[in-house]
């Protein structure tokens, strides 16, 4: 498993980001290899969001990103956010007892 973490800095309206993100997420939910995702808004800095997505592999993630439909939906995100993407490995994992 790999985790995609993208720090998003808002340059547009929050409502617009959330609407566009939902449109992109609708497509991603159908992609093989996506385990789960979340869009998080910072309590400390409301103009900062984090997109966190778990994938079964880098290959599944890369395949989804290469889809023309994804590229088309992604263009709109660039009008409302500036991203800092990071593909990450899980090094410690836990659950509450």
Model regions and ranges:
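Glycine-rich beta-strand-turn "strand-cap" elements at beta-sheet edges
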Residues: 2, 38-50, 75-97
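Active-site-flanking beta-strand signature of metal-NTP-handling nucleotidyl enzymes
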Residues: 2-8
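Short flexible/disordered coil segments
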Residues: 10, 69-72, 94-97
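Short coil/turn motifs at secondary-structure junctions
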Residues: 11-13, 42-44, 56-58
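Intrinsically disordered, low-complexity acidic/polar segments
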Residues: 15, 48, 60-62, 96-97
